[in-house]
């Protein structure tokens, strides 16, 4: 059945068009299909398969960001006070993602074994100042039900039992500390995307076109957009009432083409990445955790090193990094002109201002780009002293485009994700990077709620969303019980026993 919004059954008209077939678009597609099954919508993807760019298993950290171990989510303010608001927000958002997966798994719609593994998340530091910071973080975070199961240790032997490769060949007299949460996860977002789209494709009102690229878009009247798309050299036009731009780093270029006023203040700063990877079974079997360190003072947030157990294509691997670099491409499979084509009269000064203000980032990217294999392994040895260069090889990770936003003082470089909505709710775009994928459900619920798709029956549709996943947590006296109930329910469905 086609939507009533398209009474002419025009094959070139869709109620919604989603650009990109990564974790963001597929999450939105899943929500639309579950909550608004009669909506006729189209997903277009430039590549020949879903989840092949930023969502690709090797192209993102796959950490299952829950702020369990990422120390950059709990910074110190100017007075030395620990700020955990961001960590709490990320953790709650990730639990909503877990709730959706639990609901879909319980109803037999997806197979969690294809994308989710439970694995401890560990924060590891050395040196007295860092140990004091980690202890302060532990004490403040465990006051909250989200992190009540966190453990803290300064015992060399106990930390060795948690992560033996971290302590092997390390001087036992070294001052070290670690926190551990057993209920961490490794998420293969590429596999999850494919699960979502396999489910969505069962809806006869949904069409997915691969090897199809957005060329241009423009608003043709108050209720419609016209999109020019290209598939294997053949250009066609389609019309829609709603557009979602979820094309990774390339989104900034598409957003600018839309010419909505809200797009004028944005630019993008591309950053590339590389992993050190180990496949040796005698090492992969000894490390069963994700271990995050602490960035050096003055280093950008993206410089936080981590040694991760990952399962990719049914194979257990160790990944260390990511090592950053600079490129003018916004996607791995796109053009070196991406950055230059994104420079406009309304953002050039903010982009130049960001360049002048962020010498530390520029220097960091240059130094990272100049590293050779041995120097990268030397970096790894700070976390894994026994690392041997011959056990590791280098692999390109994904591109990320950090947000540049115009401010009164010039420009600001933002680390995170941001939704840009047109004033009439007919277009949404997702910009930025981490912790994106892990919080995709909360982000896409927000996108859907602000879109024209929910205008006619917002209350009932929001109820449908909350029946599918737990609602956003609000401050209440029963916060502790609420969070415990959600985790208990999700653990039971997933078969996780703390």
UniProtKB/Swiss-Prot annotation:
Keyword Nucleotide-binding among record annotations: no
Protein family (similarity comment): Belongs to the MQO family.
Known EC number: 1.1.5.4
Organism of derivation: Prochlorococcus marinus (strain MIT 9312)
Domain of life: Bacteria
Keywords, ordered alphabetically: FAD, Flavoprotein, Oxidoreductase, Tricarboxylic acid cycle
Cited InterPro entries: FAD/NAD-bd_sf, MQO
NCBIfam families hit by this protein: PRK05257.2-1 (NF003606), PRK05257.2-3 (NF003607), PRK05257.3-2 (NF003611)
Entry protein name: Probable malate:quinone oxidoreductase
Pathway(s) served: Carbohydrate metabolism; tricarboxylic acid cycle; oxaloacetate from (S)-malate (quinone route): step 1/1
Enzymatic class: oxidoreductase
GO term, biological process aspect, one: tricarboxylic acid cycle
Listed Pfam families: Mqo (PF06039)
Catalysed reaction equations from the record: (S)-malate + a quinone = a quinol + oxaloacetate
One annotated GO molecular function: 2-hydroxyglutarate dehydrogenase activity
Cofactor: FAD
């Amino acid at each position: 059945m086609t939507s009533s919004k398209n009474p002419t059954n025009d094959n070139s008209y869709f109620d919604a068009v989603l650009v990109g077939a990564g974790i963001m678009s597929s999450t939105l597609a899943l929500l639309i299909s579950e909550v608004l099954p009669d909506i006729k919508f189209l997903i277009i993807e430039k590549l020949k398969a879903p989840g092949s760019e930023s969502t690709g298993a090797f192209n993102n950290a796959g950490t299952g960001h829950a702020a369990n171990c990422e120390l950059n989510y709990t910074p110190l303010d100017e007075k030395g006070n620990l700020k955990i608001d961001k960590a709490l927000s990320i953790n709650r958002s990730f639990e909503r993602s877990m709730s959706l997966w639990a609901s879909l798994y319980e109803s037999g719609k997806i197979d969690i074994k294809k994308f989710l593994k439970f694995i401890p998340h560990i924060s590891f530091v050395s040196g007295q100042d860092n140990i004091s910071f980690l202890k302060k973080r532990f004490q403040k975070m465990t006051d909250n039900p989200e992190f009540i199961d966190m453990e803290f240790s300064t015992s060399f032997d106990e930390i060795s039992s948690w992560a033996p490769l971290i302590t092997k060949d390390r001087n036992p007299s070294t001052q070290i500390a670690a926190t551990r949460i057993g209920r961490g996860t490794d998420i293969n977002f590429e596999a999850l995307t494919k699960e979502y789209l396999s489910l969505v494709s069962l809806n006869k009102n949904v069409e997915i076109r691969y090897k199809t690229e957005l060329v241009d878009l423009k608003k043709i009247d108050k209720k419609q957009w016209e999109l020019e798309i290209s598939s294997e050299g053949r250009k066609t036009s389609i019309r829609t009432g709603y557009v979602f731009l979820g094309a990774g780093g390339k989104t900034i270029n598409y957003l600018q083409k839309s010419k909505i006023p809200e797009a004028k203040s944005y630019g993008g700063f591309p950053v590339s990445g590389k992993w050190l990877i180990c496949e040796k079974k005698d090492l992969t079997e000894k490390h069963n955790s994700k271990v995050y360190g602490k960035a050096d003072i003055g280093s950008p947030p993206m410089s936080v090193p981590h040694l991760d157990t990952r399962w990719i294509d049914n194979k257990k691997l160790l990944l260390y990094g990511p090592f950053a670099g600079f490129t003018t491409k916004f996607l791995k499979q796109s053009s070196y002109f991406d950055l230059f084509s994104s420079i406009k009269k309304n953002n050039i000064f903010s982009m130049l201002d960001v360049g002048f203000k962020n010498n530390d980032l520029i220097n960091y990217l240059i130094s990272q780009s100049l590293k050779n294999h041995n120097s990268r392994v030397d970096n790894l040895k700070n976390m894994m002293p026994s690392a041997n260069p011959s056990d590791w090889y280098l692999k390109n990770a994904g591109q990320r485009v950090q947000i540049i936003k115009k401010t009164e003082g010039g420009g600001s470089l933002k680390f995170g994700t941001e939704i840009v909505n047109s004033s009439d709710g007919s277009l949404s775009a997702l910009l930025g990077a981490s912790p994106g994928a892990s919080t995709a459900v909360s982000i896409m619920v927000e996108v859907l709620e602000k879109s024209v798709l929910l205008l006619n029956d917002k209350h009932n549709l929001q109820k449908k969303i909350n029946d599918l996943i737990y609602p956003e947590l609000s401050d209440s006296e029963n916060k502790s019980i609420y969070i415990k109930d959600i985790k208990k329910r999700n653990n039971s469905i997933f078969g996780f026993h703390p």
